Swiss-Prot record:
Family stated for the protein in its record: Belongs to the ABC transporter superfamily.
Segments forming domain ABC transmembrane type-1: 22-301
Membrane topology, record value: Multi-pass membrane protein
Protein name: ATP-binding protein SyrD
Keyword Transmembrane among UniProt keywords: yes
Disulfide partners: none
Keyword vocabulary terms for this entry: Antibiotic biosynthesis, ATP-binding, Cell inner membrane, Cell membrane, Membrane, Nucleotide-binding, Transmembrane, Transmembrane helix
Binding site for ATP: 380-387
Organism from which the protein derives: Pseudomonas syringae pv. syringae
Keyword Metal-binding: no
GO BP annotation list: antibiotic biosynthetic process; peptide transport
Quaternary data: Dimer.
Length: 566
């Protein structure tokens, strides 16, 4: 079952993005570009008139200075003013893309892999920004070029015909080389995504790399070095194609000037004044033409960025409104959190593909009901589906078949966000945020309460509360980071706690404290607790033990009360 987020969006148009976001500023850019174009060509005409004047004319000097100033001011205005608009547009798109990622189903993000998603933010958005910044310049130079062509037509149709013919030939040759370079533009982007994956491994696998020389040498040579060489090679070949394409422009200019000087007189009688004006105009408009030609790779890269973003379901031309929240909805949600009775998985199936390999995993059919206040252990061998089941249960993974029910009502796309708010979780691949988050967005947890939890979990000497954050989240052992993650979960104070092999990295005394003191305390406070664990010596403390094998529940056992009290 495909979700809404998985649908591919239309790539969109960068020019339409600029117009829809700031129509008046875009119109102003076009208008000033036209004025700059007219003034620039008028300067060429004044120069030509001055060349053929027999005596110095003060009026020509005034026209030359005045028109040059007008052309310069309007060209700069048309280029600089939209930079502010571009900045605002890109800020909005960055925020919207982050919200899009937050709203994308977790299984879709996992399927794509973190490096691919990060490349959207670190490569595609900056590339789109660079393209957007060059758009005003393209508009201005296009205006200058078009007025230059019109001026040539005004001077002589023969000159105009020769110019257009050679330019069409030059553009055709340019596109031939340009398309060759575009093949490598795609390769550069794909290889950069792979390089992002290696840099991620470099940072987070540094300990393993330092400990093993064979792995370190393999990683340095076969991974980082080879990927870097491929990025450089594809960049170089791409640059060769694009440079060859740009050189076509210089060749076209030389041919064009030669044809005007030596071939045009064969077809028509052209006086010296018209010929000099034509050559001056051609030389003048070649600057904008070369700039437009040079901008094509940037435009192409921006188009690729739009396509990659659209593949993720993010179109730059679609509205991206801020999420709306209602105080009344929050009150109803909080009331419901206090009174929920059961959560049911009904004939749930979930097919999951490992993003790191081609292997897949199937969960289901799963039929399971969890009641409020239960302490449930989820057990089974590695790879049996415990973590996948947990993510389905808390609403992070959307079942491809079957239903997730809260008090008999199906959890839908509209209610899934509220449903997830029932949970505080510490997964095996958890991430610590340096911010105190309480149960209510309007009320921050007290620092005294946070300090009490730090003391309870033996972190009072390692972590201090500073403002609304922690003094550190990184200068801790992995086991201590897990304890701090549990402190965060305590402060959230949600009805359901989901802990994925939390005790696996704790020392025996603290592991015992966790099972015999912390979990019973949470249960006494009315919390529902789901524990993924391998610690069979504490199984007797659970209300229920659910065992999984090959993605299916093979047993669901209720533990005797007497056994737990013994």
């Amino acid at each position: 079952m495909k979700t809404k987020q998985e649908k591919k969006a239309r790539p969109g148009s960068i020019m339409r993005l600029l117009w829809s976001s700031h129509p008046w500023l875009t119109f102003f850019t076009l208008l000033t570009g036209l004025i700059s174009g007219v003034a620039s060509i008028a300067v060429v005409n004044v120069i030509n008139q001055a060349i053929h004047e027999e005596t110095f004319q003060r009026q020509s000097l005034f026209w030359f200075v005045g028109l040059s100033v007008v052309a310069l001011l309007f060209r700069n205005g048309a280029s600089l003013f939209p930079a502010y608009a571009s900045m605002r547009i890109m800020t909005r798109l960055r925020i919207a893309l982050c919200r899009k990622i937050l709203g994308t189903p977790l299984e879709e993000v996992d399927r794509r892999g973190a490096p691919n998603v990060l490349t959207l933010l670190t490569s595609d958005i900056p590339q789109l920004n660079a393209t957007l910044l060059i758009m005003p310049t393209i508009l201005v130079e296009s205006a200058v070029f078009l007025f230059g062509i019109a001026y040539l037509a005004y001077l002589s149709w023969v000159v105009f015909a020769i110019t257009i013919s050679l330019m069409i030939l030059g553009v055709a040759m340019y596109l031939l080389f340009f398309m060759g370079g575009m093949k490598f533009t795609h390769k550069v982007r794909d290889e950069f995504t792979a390089f992002n994956e290696y840099t991620h491994a470099l940072v987070f696998g540094l300990k393993e790399l330092k400990l093993n020389g064979i792995r370190r040498r393999w990683f340095s040579r076969s991974a980082i070095q080879e990927s870097s060489v491929r990025v450089a090679k594809y960049n170089y070949i791409e640059r060769l194609w694009f440079t060859a394409a740009e050189n076509v422009g210089q060749l076209t200019l030389s041919l064009l000037v030669g044809c005007l000087l030596f071939a045009a007189p064969m077809f028509a009688v052209i006086d010296a004044k018209t010929m000099s004006a034509s050559v001056l105009a051609v030389l003048y408009i070649m600057g904008p033409l070369v700039m437009l030609v040079s901008a094509m790779p940037m435009l192409a890269q921006g188009r690729i960025a739009c396509t990659r973003l659209a593949d993720f379901g993010f179109s730059i031309n679609e509205p991206h409104p801020e999420p709306e929240t209602s105080d009344a909805d929050n009150v109803l949600l909080l009331d419901h959190k206090k009174s929920w009775g059961s959560i049911q998985l009904k004939n749930v199936h979930m097919n999951y593909k490992d993003p790191q390999s081609s292997s897949g995993f199937a969960l289901g059919p799963i039929d399971l009901t969890i009641h409020s206040g239960e302490l449930v252990y989820i057990v089974g061998g590695n790879g049996c589906g415990k973590s996948t089941l947990a993510k389905v249960f808390c609403g992070l993974y959307i079942p491809q078949e079957g239903q997730l029910l809260l008090d008999g009502a199906a959890v839908t796309d509209d209610s899934r966000g509220d449903y997830r708010d029932l949970f505080s979780a510490v997964f095996s691949d958890f991430h610590l945020f340096n911010r105190l988050i309480g149960p209510d967005e309007k009320e921050h947890p007290s620092t005294d309460q946070a300090q009490t939890y730090l003391s309870t979990l033996g972190l009072e000497d390692k972590v201090k509360i500073e403002g609304l954050g922690y003094s550190t989240t990184t200068a801790l052992s992995y086991g201590q980071q897990k304890r701090l993650a549990l402190v965060c979960a305590y402060l959230e104070d949600r009805p359901i706690y989901l802990l994925d092999e939390w005790a696996a990295d704790q020392d025996p005394p603290f592991k015992r404290f966790f099972y015999e003191e912390l979990l019973p305390d949470l249960k006494r406070r009315g919390k529902t607790i789901l524990i993924i664990t391998h610690d069979d010596q504490y199984f007797q403390l659970a209300d229920r033990i659910i065992k999984l094998a090959d993605g299916c529940i093979v047993s669901d056992v209720k533990c005797a009360v007497e056994g737990k009290r013994a």
